[in-house]
UniProtKB/Swiss-Prot annotation:
This is Protein DEFECTIVE IN EXINE FORMATION 1. Mostly expressed in buds, and, to a lower extent, in leaves, roots and seedlings. It is found in: Cell membrane. GO terms for molecular function: calcium ion binding. The chain crosses the membrane at residues 859-879. SUPFAM superfamilies: Integrin alpha N-terminal domain.
């Protein structure tokens, strides 16, 4: 009996250890974003507008573009005329360029393409003609290049599909985390899966069957490969529920069927015409699942890909808007099947009577207001009187040949080629020091439910279930050959999993080990944080595990020790700081989804670096870079979700000596917030629109003050002027300031061309000088970030027959002003001087200015013509007779 008891005890202990192995705990995934379940406070408009610290913003201009602006625009001088332009990636079909002075559209723009856009534009000279083209990564995995005239070039980069085994998902371990053996291509796979299933059923009958996911890491061109498996998330037991009815899930990134209970930050506003997916998942309330202690109703998320008229909130007119309304203005057309399902709207917590303060209004109209739309419901009259008068008129028949069509799929019995999609901005850098620039693209692979809702398209796939194939990879292109250099395959999952294998955020490139090669950092929605070298090899101790990572990984010196730290955030409200070796420094739980990577800077002016984090609950947190503690008086509470990256900028007026930075952001309550860093005193501007894109800053109108650029989901672009003087290091022209810098540069670190040489001018002779200044004001104990590797490049377009890129490199060991001698080309043309600097940690800083060469030679010709005439006139005056001589008279002599 004793031996049997011992055997039973050993078996129980073995089963318990296996259970703990298969369902390993992770502190980041176990936490919940509880603040997202709370309602937003009511807006006191009088208190907001009657601020005690006005920033005195003035609206300089406002322009409407063709559709919603989801990705952050780019500020640049694209045609080397000395004037800044704003490159706006409209969400649907168009890339636009606005003149910074007045917001007018430049001639030749907008430029058309067939896809949607989730990424910001970049500048790169793809054809080596001395003029940088505008690179735009599209949703359908193409990187297009546009000339400054708006012409779409034939050169483009195409991301190949990912090939996976058709039955890769069959027999997988549920929620695997044991990485000691692969979960695919394993002979004993089915036996282990059946044993685990039976063990799970016996030990925990009340636990719901977990979803199946697997993380794969495999280099396609290498000899060695491995497969790593990762636990999605422990299913909720007892008092833990899958999803709560209170925060009605919002449909973000709906082309990936975002039916999970997360607020995916990488999506369009639900209900807009340009929604990434016109499918709405239906939330079915399972009344049989009631939490015992919290008494909260559990909801089950239907993963159906079909268009549903049973939307949360206003389901009544879902189908009519889609089937009847076929003509109207593109920006204003309503589509009920894509109705807004805001997680903090009126459907949430109605029992508590909390009024939601947001500009996302899902409520019905009053009778008088509703009657005013009767004319618009006369569809026949509307088509006759309205259709042909507007350039944004929508007739679905006219757009049939302009929509994207996927290429033919390869027919295979054993494998599936998954469509590639790009949901974030690529990065351009020379990661391997070969002198050739590479483009690093984070790619998500899946079958778009909207596209394959068409039976003809679905038929091409051979009857597979498209929900079983979601994957992610890093694809690196050689920009000289325009070919794929290498591919690193990362995660692989199904759509039914708690965590799915998308990549929503741009990769970050930085030198982690000081070898001069750039490493690639990326976080995936599968919850894994990868760090790989310039060849795609995963670094030791990586990947690190968190919940779904939506924001970019930030590489910066956050604790002022002179070394790079890595900061990651996730959808469960976690933020963590790591060393470059993957060791945790500190972590904090903010209790709300973090949609974007944090911004770095000395916010309160105390000489120490802070980490500033936006959340979907509306709270803006300022954390100490040393230990992650909350800096008071933060968090600052807005009245709507904050879904964009925060701008940190010095808005001090001329002569003002205040320390600290201003936090600038938009919120889903329709206000633009300007929060004083040291005091959190706030000034607001009522723009009445929502925004996912970052607020940008620069002197775009040619004056001497700093301007703010705000773009919205309604397709409006605003330019606000501030009384703060402009400085090149205050400018924030793109979300990553060129490559990998998420930190404020002014009074911190950077390089810029001095005011004496950055002005637009004409150069003659054989050489000219450019003066730069390196700024490095890191404080003790870190010291300086030297050495500084400065590369100066002169881009020469036009009819110049020599080298179009004239490059000089110099290493400086201390900050200060330096003069660089550059050659003057012997033709009449324009030019752009780019100054790029990388410090010892590989952080990238840049500045640029434009100039002309020999453009005013006709002034010399003018003097060559005028001077001889003036000389002759002078000689006539000098050589005139000195004595008076009577003039001949022709009068008649009357004496004769």
């Amino acid at each position: 009996m004793k031996s049997r008891a011992r055997q039973c005890l050993l078996v129980c202990l073995l089963c318990l250890s296996l259970t703990n192995l298969s369902y390993g705990e992770n502190k980041f995934r176990e936490r919940k974003a509880t603040d997202d379940e709370l309602g937003y406070p009511d807006i006191d408009e009088d208190a907001l507008l009657n601020t005690q610290c006005p920033k005195k913003l003035e609206l300089r201009w406002q322009t409407e573009v063709t559709s919603s602006v989801y990705a952050t625009p780019l500020i640049a001088d694209i045609n080397s005329d000395g004037k800044l332009d704003i490159v706006v990636p409209s969400f649907v079909h168009y890339l636009e360029v606005l003149e910074g002075a007045d917001g007018d559209k430049m001639p030749g723009w907008p430029a058309f393409h067939q896809s949607n856009v989730h990424s910001s534009p970049l500048l790169f000279d793809i054809d080596k003609d001395g003029v940088r083209e505008i690179a735009l990564a599209t949703y359908n995995a193409e990187v297009l290049f546009f000339r400054v005239s708006g012409f779409l070039m034939s050169d483009k980069l195409e991301v190949p599909r990912r090939k996976v085994h058709k039955n890769w998902h069959v027999g997988l371990n549920p929620d695997p985390v044991d990485r000691s053996h692969p979960d695919v291509h394993d002979d004993v796979l089915e036996e282990e899966a059946m044993a685990m299933k039976s063990s799970t059923t016996q030990t925990n009958a009340t636990t719901t069957t977990p979803n199946v996911t697997v993380s794969m890491t495999k280099e396609v061109h290498g000899a060695n490969s491995y497969v790593s498996t990762q636990e999605d998330q422990k299913r909720p037991e007892n008092n833990q529920t899958e999803a709560i009815v209170k925060p009605t899930p919002e449909l973000h990134n709906s082309s990936m069927d975002a039916g999970a209970n997360n607020l995916a930050a990488n999506a369009t506003t639900a209900g807009s015409r340009e929604n990434l997916n016109r499918n709405v998942t239906t939330n079915e309330v399972d009344q049989s699942k009631i939490s015992g202690d919290k008494n909260e109703t559990v909801i089950k998320l239907n993963t159906s890909t079909g268009n549903s008229s049973e939307t949360l909130g206003t389901s009544g007119n879902s189908s009519t808007a889609e089937t009847v309304t076929k003509s109207g203005r593109r920006l204003l057309e309503e589509d009920g099947s894509k109705e807004s399902v805001d997680s903090h709207s009126d459907s949430k917590d109605n029992s508590e009577g909390v009024r939601m303060a947001t500009v996302e209004n899902d409520g019905g109209l009053e009778a008088d207001a509703d009657s005013s739309f009767e004319l618009l419901r006369e569809n026949d009259e509307l088509a006759d009187e309205y259709s042909y008068d507007y350039d944004d008129y929508v007739d679905e028949k006219m757009w049939g040949d302009e929509e994207w069509v996927e290429g033919q799929h390869e027919n295979s019995e054993d494998y599936v080629n998954i469509d590639a999609h790009i949901l974030c901005t690529p990065v351009i850098a020379d990661i391997d020091k070969d002198g050739v620039q590479e483009m690093i693209v984070a790619v998500s692979y899946f079958f778009d439910p909207e596209y394959y809702d068409n039976p003809e398209h679905l038929k091409e796939l051979g009857g597979i279930d498209i929900k079983n194939y979601i994957a992610s990879s890093i694809v690196v292109f050689n920009l000289d050959t325009k070919q794929v250099k290498w591919i690193k395959e990362l995660d692989l999952s199904t759509d039914k999993a708690n965590f799915r294998a998308y990549i929503y955020s741009s990769p970050t490139v930085v030198d982690l080990d000081g070898d001069g090669y750039l490493d690639i950092l990326v976080g995936t929605s599968f919850g894994l944080f990868y760090a790989m070298d310039h060849r795609g090899n995963i670094r030791e101790k990586f990947p690190l595990e968190m919940a779904e990572i939506q924001g970019a990984v930030v590489a910066a010196d956050i604790n002022d020790d002179g070394k790079i730290e890595l900061v990651t955030t996730d959808s469960h409200g976690n933020i963590a700081a790591w060393t470059t070796q993957g060791v945790e420094i500190w972590e904090a739980h903010l209790k709300s989804l973090v949609p974007q990577g944090p911004s770095i800077g000395d916010v309160d002016g105390d000489g120490h670096t802070e980490v500033v984090v936006p959340t979907s609950s509306g709270n803006i947190y300022v954390l100490s870079g040393k230990d992650g503690s909350i800096v008071r008086p933060y968090p600052y509470r807005t009245h709507g979700r904050v879904m964009n990256q925060l701008l940190l900028v010095d808005l001090n007026k001329r002569g003002e000596k205040k320390k600290g930075l201003t936090i600038v952001t938009t919120s889903f309550d329709g206000y633009l917030y300007l929060i004083d860093g040291p005091t959190s005193c706030t000034d607001v501007v009522d723009i009445g629109e929502t925004s996912y894109s970052m607020v940008l800053a620069d002197n775009v109108d040619g004056g001497d003050d700093l301007d703010l650029i705000v773009s919205t989901m309604n397709g409006n672009v605003f330019c606000f002027s501030t009384p703060s003087p402009h400085h090149p290091l205050k400018a924030w022209r793109s979300s990553d300031q060129g490559r990998n810098n998420k930190a404020n540069r002014y009074d911190r670190e950077g390089v810029f061309v001095t005011h004496s040489t950055r002005g637009f001018r004409d150069e003659e002779g054989k050489n000219f000088w450019a003066e730069i200044e390196i700024v490095d004001k890191y404080r003790y104990p870190s010291g300086s970030q030297a050495p500084y590797n400065v590369t100066t490049t002169l881009l020469v377009p036009g009819n110049y027959q020599g080298e179009r890129r004239i490059t000089q490199s110099q290493i400086y060991d201390r900050p200060g002003k330096y003069r660089i001698k550059l050659p003057t080309v012997g033709v009449r043309t324009t030019g752009t001087v780019m100054v790029e600097m990388a410090d010892k940690n590989g952080l990238h800083f840049s500045d640029e200015f434009s100039l002309t060469f020999h453009m005013y030679y006709y002034k010399l010709l003018k003097w060559l013509l005028v001077l001889p005439m003036l000389g002759m006139f002078g000689l006539l005056v000098i050589l005139r007779p000195q004595e008076a001589v009577p003039l001949p008279s022709f009068s008649r002599n009357t004496d004769l």
